[in-house]
Amino acid sequence: MSKSKAYHAELIESLRDSHEAEEYLNAALEEDNPDLFLVALRNVAEAQGGVAQLADKTKLNRESLYKMLSERGNPELKSLDALLHALGFRLAVAANR
């Protein structure tokens, strides 16, 4: 197995822990790069069972979820909220410090 595949497998395994996933998503948000956050969200979604399982939880269709999590994804707030809720998280606002 290549180093990058081994790293990805370890990352996905660690993101099965909700605290690890929370820290990972927050770190991605702090980078102020929406594309990076979508990559992080894709990884957490994969760790939590993938798009098929999330489609059932979010009541969104698979195609919409795949599109939302793609490299060109631009999720609507309502869809993002539904996805985060299905993953066990919520949207929050904090003061910029």
Which sequence ranges carry the predicted segments?
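Short alpha-helical DNA-recognition segment
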Residues: 47-67
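Long, contiguous binding/interaction regions
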Residues: 59, 96-97
